[in-house]
Amino acid sequence: MTDLRHYDVIVSPVITEKSTMVSEHNQVVFNVARKATKPEIKAAVEALFGVKVTAVNTAVRKGKVKRFRGLVGRQSDVKKAIVTLAEGQSIDVSTGL
């Protein structure tokens, strides 16, 4: 049985043109929790999707400054994880968990 904390680590899959291109290299892109570490991300992906992870790369996208009705606000920072899977394994992100 999967640990409920794994669902807190993986926020959502990233479906963009660039993330679709890296899927050809056995990589999948996820938005993850800001405080999630690489070992936590690896454990969560392996537990939730039943695949073998070989590498995890992370990047933090800084939030943009936006204006709304004259007030200045700031979007939240987003942490993104590029997960490399073992040869011959894949994840279908279009289906839910």
Swiss-Prot record:
Show the disulfide pairing: none
Cite a GO CC annotation. ribonucleoprotein complex
The superkingdom of the source organism is Bacteria
A GO term (biological process) for this protein? translation
Instruction: Recite the UniProt keywords alphabetically.
Output: Ribonucleoprotein, Ribosomal protein, RNA-binding, rRNA-binding
Q: Which GO terms describe its molecular function?
A: rRNA binding; structural constituent of ribosome
Asked if the Swiss-Prot or TrEMBL record annotates the protein with the keyword Transcription, the reply is no
Short name of any one Pfam family annotated for the protein: Ribosomal_L23
What family is this protein classified in? Answer: Belongs to the universal ribosomal protein uL23 family.
Listed under subunit, the entry gives: Part of the 50S ribosomal subunit. Contacts protein L29, and trigger factor when it is bound to the ribosome.
PANTHER family according to UniProt: 60S RIBOSOMAL PROTEIN L23A
The protein's role, per its UniProt record = One of the early assembly proteins it binds 23S rRNA. One of the proteins that surrounds the polypeptide exit tunnel on the outside of the ribosome. Forms the main docking site for trigger factor binding to the ribosome.
Q: What is this protein called?
A: Large ribosomal subunit protein uL23
Q: Which gene encodes it?
A: rplW
